[in-house]
Amino acid sequence: MLISNEWLKDYVNVDQSVQALAERITRTGIEVDDIIDYTKDIKKLVVGHVLSKTPHPNADKLNICQVDLGEEEPVQIVCGAPNVDEGQHVIVAKVGGRLPGGIKIKRAKLRGERSEGMICSLQEIGISSHVTPKNYESGIYVFPEAVKPGTDALEAIYLNDQVMEFDLTPNRADALSMVGTAYEVAALYQTKMNKPQLTSNESQESAKDELTIEVKNEDKVPYYSTRVVHDVTIGPSPVWMQFRLIKAGIRPINNVVDISNYVLLEYGQPLHMFDQEQIGSQSIEVRQAKKDETMRTLDGEERRLLDTDIVITNGKDPIALGGVMGGDFSEVTEQTRHVVVEGAIFDPVSIRHTSRRLNLRSESSSRFEKGIATEFVDEAVDRACYLLERYASGTVLKDRVSHGDLGSFVTPIEITADKVNRTIGFNLTDEEIIDIFEQLGFDTENKNGEITVNVPSRRKDISIKEDLIEEVARIYGYDEIPSTLPVFKDVTSGELTDRQFKTRTVKETLEGAGLDQAITYSLVSKNHATDFALQNRPTIELLMPMSEAHSTLRQSLLPHLIDAVSYNVARKNTNVKLYEIGRVFFGNGEGELPDEVEYLSGILTGDFVNNTWQGKKESVDFYLTKGVVERIAEKLNLQFDFRAGQIDGLHPGRTAIVSLNGKDIGFIGELHPTLAANNDLKRTYVFELNYDAMMEVSVGYINYEPIPRFPGVTRDIALEVNHEVTSSELLSIIHENGEDILNDTLVFDVYEGEHLEKGKKSIAIRLSYLDTENTLTDERVNAVHDKILEALKKHGAIIR
């Protein structure tokens, strides 16, 4: 937003330099990105009166002009502008003057004729060509009315000014207007804010006799208002208005269109002007567009509409795309006599979707998207009517023709001085706090220390007590917050918490295994929000997402990790191993806060060990991924159990469910081939674990055990079992019968093939026996070993 200091003084007059004002505004949270000084690099620029023009004797495209600069004698200037003419009042750079770009004006001879100065175009004095009025695009600027020769030209065109450029955050849409900015400045300097003139001399004719309004989509258009102005005269707007628009980055068109844009900048309320005689009916109907309905917009483009678009119609055909752009056949032209001024409230989400889809971003649509102040809708329409009466000679008809309800202009919020002072460390009285709010234009009521603040609709960033406290701190001054040392009841030395220590251990373990940490977005598309989710829980969707791809809170970390791996592989980084520790979100129904759960996820693809000088290479596989997970469990002193399972998105035969103390906490598996192919990935393996559940169980340390004083005994067994029997089932049987001397087990071979029946496999297991208190005897080991073998036989295993 570009804020002209000359324009701002209409509403609030502060005796401060623009630099000081910009610094004060920045300290309150609105960043002033730049200050544009139109007087910079300009010297000796005055108004000149062209007394005569004669053709240059030696050049067809040059003219010799005698120009009165308010001095004793006129000066001769050779000018090549095609629109220069006798009697004009123009901008002249005198000899010794300077123009932007380091141009110095000197006496010169042009094709043999003396020239003492330069008649200037707007571009030559620093005005961008994209905001220069079209009739001056290829020539000099000509004043529409006589100006005393010798007058400072910058003052004559209101460029003796400095303009602040605001870099606004989306929550401060109120500062997208001159009036909104004036409220802010008035509060900062505790001065009065003057509102614009609104009252017109209305005729006795009523607009209600000429126009009716019907809104069929009140959920998208809660309020639609119009006024009618007759007998307008189309022409240029006054110089001061033209140059205020230019300084705000808008090209002047004509008085009617300029007034619409002027009020937009003044109030932040988009308006639209219809040519009443071109509407084609006395009825305006607002509705949703019909699918594949078409209309031609002001830019001359034929637009195909969707049923999500809002259209303004004459009861039959669209005459405007609501909140985005008008239609071409009802636009204001030089032949326009009567205009209908429209002000409305449109649904921000609908406007954003329409403007983005059609690539029609404008000053109006951007304001509707952020939400407009209901208190300013009718004021802005009345202001436009006042300006049309004054600068377009229009006659304003009495009465407003509208549909809907503006609702409340304020949101009441209660607060106390004690709450304010405890939060920000001030020591303000009720009166001082109330004064700050009233300077901001907020009405207040104080009942026994309970201050009710009525927040106006223009301040959509204020909805809770803490927002009000922030306003007090901003306006009173962050610099005024006293410095205090923190006071602690129980002072302890800084150290890692138990959870932080465990997390550091997990990260070191994963990074030691070659995985890199990733941090991905918490928001995913609605279609992928429940991918890989173990729980069937509601999702949480944003009310106003910035894009469909980031509209819903995730229930798994894997969708974005898969995207990250796909991105790397597409750029020839084919060996990727990532992990992430982050939160996922599960809904609890309407009106309930969601559950936030921390997860640990990983993804591996390509080679785990690259080709080395030894010629060895090891690709990522299921068991390697499982080994990474088991290593985490070992570091946290946890015992994971694994069983075959199925998860949507994973290979049905290469997936294991991970459980802890009988509760499922995650899974390991290979990406389903279809999903992998869709992401241009080869075999890719993932794991996801409920990190919170792991932290609850983990003791975070490993008990010390001394080196055994007595030797252990190992026995190897080979078991022939059915193909569907898993090694974990066999190990479970072994441990159940191993008594207290079975120290460890290890599966060291699995064989399928010759010498075995079809549907059979052989699993070789090493059993380690140890007694920490006594020397093991063969009798005791044999007894326990035989017990284990008998138990295995009962479950169908054949001892080989």
Curated annotation (Swiss-Prot):
Q: Which PANTHER family match?
A: PHENYLALANINE--TRNA LIGASE BETA SUBUNIT, PHENYLALANYL-TRNA SYNTHETASE BETA CHAIN AND LEUCINE-RICH REPEAT-CONTAINING PROTEIN 47
Annotated FDX-ACB domain ranges read 708-800
Q: Does the keyword RNA-binding apply?
A: yes
Q: Which cysteines are joined by disulfide bonds?
A: none
- Primary localisation category: cytoplasm
Gene Ontology BP terms:
phenylalanyl-tRNA aminoacylation
Q: Which Pfam families match?
A: B3_4, B5, FDX-ACB, tRNA_bind, tRNA_synthFbeta
Q: Gene behind this chain?
A: pheT
Assembly information from the UniProt record = Tetramer of two alpha and two beta subunits.
Q: Which family does it belong to?
A: Belongs to the phenylalanyl-tRNA synthetase beta subunit family. Type 1 subfamily.
What residue ranges carry the coiled-coil annotation? none
Give the reactions, separated by semicolons, that this protein catalyses.
Answer: tRNA(Phe) + L-phenylalanine + ATP = L-phenylalanyl-tRNA(Phe) + AMP + diphosphate + H(+)
Residues engaged in binding Mg(2+) = 461, 467, 470-471
Instruction: Cite the PROSITE patterns for this sequence.
Output: B5 (PS51483), FDX_ACB (PS51447), TRBD (PS50886)
Record has Magnesium as a keyword: yes
Single Gene Ontology MF annotation: phenylalanine-tRNA ligase activity
What is the protein name given in its UniProt record? Phenylalanine--tRNA ligase beta subunit
Q: Which UniProt keywords apply?
A: Aminoacyl-tRNA synthetase, ATP-binding, Cytoplasm, Ligase, Magnesium, Metal-binding, Nucleotide-binding, Protein biosynthesis, RNA-binding, tRNA-binding
